């Protein structure tokens, strides 16, 4: 497997309110499902199409390639093929993404980011506070069908790196501590919500691999998220005998700050030491990718007003993280951008560090270090 240096194209085909709040202003909703419920169908479709046409363009793929990256992770929804109204399908934009990627020498990891009734209850799962997809066999089958159709449509494209089976199926500890848990708008809809059990996930991954691999050659990679349980997979992958697979983990240092509120480099190093011990253990049986990470941290953000000191601190933390990821099979920065206008101020200073394009512009990240 090539060493991945990549970025995520989040909030393009799967919306996340915090990244572009103006899309949600007229409805005061928190996720894409409720946005679709509050707007008239035609108005919703027009809003989505305008966003997709303008949020990511060919120019972005050129920019990504010119900054020494070789892969993009592209989150796609369960309604990709336009068969779950009122949601708007997105194969038109995925097709464009492949054309642009191949033009600029990039590859794409297609990432199934949402499923009906959600796998995590996050806004990025499409329905905040609801998480019981795994309890619906018909919707589990639907997700498998989406994966198979993605493999059929894109499996032979030279720009395809691989397909990720499912983003962030939630574990018990993460579900119990997630801010979104218990925040569903419709409490009836949220009944039965809970974490995704590991036995179910192992079975789903086995079935998904078979469905994808039928249509995708072994030169393409099937990627599995660790479900926030990085060390739970060794025996499974050792016995599964899959070909060309990788495990995806999402080691965000900002998440550690919620539990250890000491924003100092030595604390981040200690946290990453623990993360890397888990990754090394997992890599005895499967390559591991840091599929989402960023340099967001309070150590740098708290001195944002001092541009020189702030930049120095972000570079310091970036080096710590990038040094760690060199031991992995590669990484994808979350996210490529937040606001389309890179000169427009974000409503919170910390959001700047989630935006790769701004990190490069601000000198917080240097492509020579990738």
Tell what function each PLM region has.
Residues 3-9, 72-74, 108-112, 161-163, ...:
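Hydrophobic faces of well-ordered beta-strands that scaffold small-molecule active sites
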Residues 305-320, 324-370:
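Aromatic-rich peripheral "rim/lid" segments of glycoside hydrolase catalytic domains that contact
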Residues 44-72, 82, 86-114, 124-165, ...:
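An active-site-proximal structural segment forming one wall of the substrate-binding cleft
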Residues 10-12, 77, 113-117, 165-168, ...:
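Active-site beta-loop-alpha junctions enriched in small/polar residues
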